[in-house]
Structures are given as structure tokens and as C-alpha cells.
Amino acid sequence: MDLLQFLAFLFVLLLSGMGATGTLRTSLDPSLEIYKKMFEVKRREQLLALKNLAQLNDIHQQYKILDVMLKGLFKVLEDSRTVLTAADVLPDGPFPQDEKLKDAFSHVVENTAFFGDVVLRFPRIVHYYFDHNSNWNLLIRWGISFCNQTGVFNQGPHSPILSLMAQELGISEKDSNFQNPFKIDRTEFIPSTDPFQKALREEEKRRKKEEKRKEIRKGPRISRSQSEL
């Protein structure tokens, strides 16, 4: 799978909602229960995509893919928040029945979880983009809060993802025994740790040099009138 194909696949993951159908409502919202099952399918697709990304074993391509993917992910998250907020959809309320609202709900839940996966598997790369972006910080804080109230993450294998993500990002205080299991043991996702770390350092140096060159080009220039004095 080449770079363009992989990016296209990721965008399908970001934009394809899995809204549940059904109109019956009880104390256990049946539409939400249906969605939870579909969410499990979506999670398997997301984790497979990340496994394929890690197996590229090319930090330069990983940077490029994650750069595009994160921008797309937060754009979807921001648009979905706007839709849900405008319609006064409560995360702990009945599962929305309107198709547009169902898609927005799905996008928030799935992309927040997916971002958690990315953070835990590629923490250094994500911190490079995330730590200086206040808008992303506000969006993911909102996303985590929304997801925590939906009931989707109450039980099952995905229940720890929100807490681990929040601790890794510094959004919540780290527990005394906090460990990022994917950061410590990369054997499932990254075949060779040492070359990865070396390539990561090289890519970070290259990008810092690019940023410095851009800053120099953007620096103050002597106006024509000043040069004539």
C-alpha cells in the first residue's frame, strides 16, 4: 500500500460514521447498544490501520501520514462538535435519531478514540504537533469529556483509552503507576526500536531546521523608504 492509498484509507476511517438505526427507547437505549457493537467493528479497523502504519518502518512517511491524518481528524472533530452543540445533543442523553446527528456523534466518539490510539503508539510524533496547538488541546478535552459521558467506554477493552490518552497528553494528572503500555513495548507495532528512534531524531532535527528557515524568511524586512534614507 503506497502513501496515497494509505492516506485515502485513513480518511475513510475518519469520515465514515457508524450510526445505529432503530427508534425504540428503554432505560438501556437500544440504538446506543446497537451502536456499541458497530463501534467494536470500527475499532478493529482503526487498530489495523495503525498496525499497518507502524509496519512502514519509515519515520519520514509516518510523519507525513500523521501530519495529514491529524489535521483531518481534528477538522472532523471540530465540525462534529459544531453540529452537536447547535442541536443541543447531550452525550448522556438518548442516542440521536437524525442521520446528521448520528454521524456527528459517531465521528466524535470514533475519532477521539482513534486519536487516543495514535497518541499512545506514536507519542513523540503526536506531541510534536499537539503540544503547541491550543485549539487541538481544547477540542480533545471536549472530546474526552463527551465520550466519558456517552456510556460507550464504560466497559470492554476500550474503556482505558480515554484515561491513558488524557494522562499521556498531560490533560489529567498522571497516576503514580501510570505507564503507556504501547510506548514501552513496541514489538507488536514497530519491528525495530533502535532504528526508529534514530530516524525520529533525524526527522525532528530536519523539521526544526525547516522551521528556523521559515522564521528567517518571515523576519522583519527593511522597507523601501527606510533603505532610501
UniProtKB/Swiss-Prot annotation:
Residues listed as glycosylation sites in the UniProt record: 148
BP terms from Gene Ontology: angiogenesis; embryonic hemopoiesis; embryonic liver development; placenta development; positive regulation of MyD88-dependent toll-like receptor signaling pathway; positive regulation of Wnt signaling pathway; regulation of ossification; regulation of protein glycosylation
Motif Nuclear localization signal positions after renumbering to this chain: 206-213
Signal peptide: 1-22
Motif (Prevents secretion from ER): 148
Residue stretches spanning the membrane: none
Alphabetized InterPro entries for the sequence: Coiled-coil_dom_con_pro_134 (IPR026321)
Location in the cell: Endoplasmic reticulum lumen; Secreted; Cytoplasm; Nucleus
Pfam families from the UniProt entry: ERK-JNK_inhib (PF15002)
Gene Ontology CC, one term: nucleus
Keyword DNA-binding: no
UniProt-recorded Gene Ontology molecular function terms: protein-macromolecule adaptor activity
Annotated region (Disordered), positions in chain: 193-229
Keywords, in A-Z order: Coiled coil, Cytoplasm, Endoplasmic reticulum, Glycoprotein, Nucleus, Osteogenesis imperfecta, Secreted, Signal
PTM info: O-glycosylated, with additional sialic acid modifications.
Tissue spec: Expressed in cervical gland, cervical squamous epithelium, endometrium, stomach, kidney distal convoluted tubule, spermatogenic cells in testis, mammary gland, liver and striated muscle (at protein level). Also detected in placenta. Highest expression in testis relative to other tissues. Detected in T cells and dendritic cells; highly expressed in activated CD8(+) T cells, and also expressed at lower levels in CD4(+) T cells.
Subunit (UniProt): Interacts with TADA2A. Associates with the PCAF complex via TADA2A binding.
Disease: Osteogenesis imperfecta 22: An autosomal recessive form of osteogenesis imperfecta, a disorder of bone formation characterized by low bone mass, bone fragility and susceptibility to fractures after minimal trauma. Disease severity ranges from very mild forms without fractures to intrauterine fractures and perinatal lethality. Extraskeletal manifestations, which affect a variable number of patients, are dentinogenesis imperfecta, hearing loss, and blue sclerae. OI22 is a severe form of the disease.
Family to which the UniProt record says this protein belongs: Belongs to the CCDC134 family.
Record function comment: Molecular adapter required to prevent protein hyperglycosylation of HSP90B1: during translation, associates with nascent HSP90B1 and the STT3A catalytic component of the OST-A complex and tethers them to a specialized translocon that forms a microenvironment for HSP90B1 folding. In the CCDC134-containing translocon, STT3A associates with the SRT pseudosubstrate motif of HSP90B1, preventing access to facultative glycosylation sites until folding is completed, preventing hyperglycosylation and subsequent degradation of HSP90B1.
Protein's UniProt name: Coiled-coil domain-containing protein 134
Lineage, uppermost ranks: Eukaryota, Metazoa, Chordata, Craniata, Vertebrata
